[in-house]
């Protein structure tokens, strides 16, 4: 199958459920853990339903406004979600402790980059050049924002994604051990990578 017939479009609030589902895939369950920690704010909802509510917002890093969807024949087959990482010294959390399971992800960032928070494709649409196309879109977004680099996190066990990112010029900057949890589908290390635009 080729990239032919695949279109890209800005996400809308109505896409929030699909965004949450794809984000769950790209994070290998990490966001399911995040959404589970918010369950007291959303009683009776499953993690992906909580994610959909959060992505329906127009504000914040985790908003549909930061996502581009890939479609084929009217069906969403993938997504790219990005947001800028704050400049160094711009402030941040007010000293609240970080959840130990999330600490590795919280500390791995590169200021002044466009962070790819989710690059996901459904199983039957991988290996078609769509990931490369999405990284190209992210590079365009970074240039539009005046940023000169991209950043992302990837699990060392995700060989397919690592191969794509290395081919696209990403290099390892740092890594941290994954804290095991039943909702997180990976072990080993999570790797912080950057690439020029």
Regions found by a protein language model. Give the residues of each.
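C-terminal "cap" of GNAT-fold acetyltransferases
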Residues: 148-151, 155-162, 167-168, 178-197
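A short beta-loop-alpha structural element at the N-terminal edge
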Residues: 7-22, 27-34
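A short helix-loop-beta-strand connector motif used in the catalytic cores of GNAT acetyltransferases and
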Residues: 56-69, 85-90, 115
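Glycine-rich acetyl-CoA-binding "A-motif" of GNAT/NAT acetyltransferases
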Residues: 75-78, 160
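Conserved acyl-donor/pantetheine-binding loop and adjacent beta-alpha core of acyl/acetyltransferases
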Residues: 81-118
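Conserved acetyl-CoA-binding loop-helix of GNAT-fold acetyltransferases
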Residues: 121, 127-144, 163-167
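Conserved GNAT acetyl-CoA-binding A-motif
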Residues: 113-114, 135, 142-153
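Conserved GNAT-fold acetyl-CoA-binding loop/helix
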Residues: 28-55, 65-66
């Amino acid at each position: 199958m080729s990239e032919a017939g695949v279109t890209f479009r800005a996400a809308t609030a109505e896409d929030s459920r699909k965004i949450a589902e794809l984000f769950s895939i790209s994070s290998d369950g990490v966001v399911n853990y995040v959404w589970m920690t918010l369950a007291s704010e959303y009683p009776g909802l499953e993690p992906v339903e909580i994610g959909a509510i959060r992505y329906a917002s127009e504000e914040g890093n985790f908003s549909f406004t930061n996502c581009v969807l890939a479609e084929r024949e009217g069906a969403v087959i993938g997504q790219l979600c990005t947001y800028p990482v704050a400049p160094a010294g711009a402030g941040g959390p007010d000293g609240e402790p970080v959840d130990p399971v999330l600490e590795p992800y919280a500390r791995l960032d590169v200021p002044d980059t466009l962070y790819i928070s989710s690059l996901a494709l459904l199983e039957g649409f991988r290996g078609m050049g769509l990931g490369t196309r999405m990284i190209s879109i992210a590079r365009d977004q970074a240039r539009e924002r005046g940023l000169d680099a991209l950043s992302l996190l990837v699990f060392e066990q995700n060989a397919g994604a690592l191969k794509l990112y290395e081919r696209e010029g990403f290099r390892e900057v740092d890594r941290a051990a994954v804290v095991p949890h039943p909702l997180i589908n990976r072990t080993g290390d999570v790797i912080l990578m950057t690439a020029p635009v």
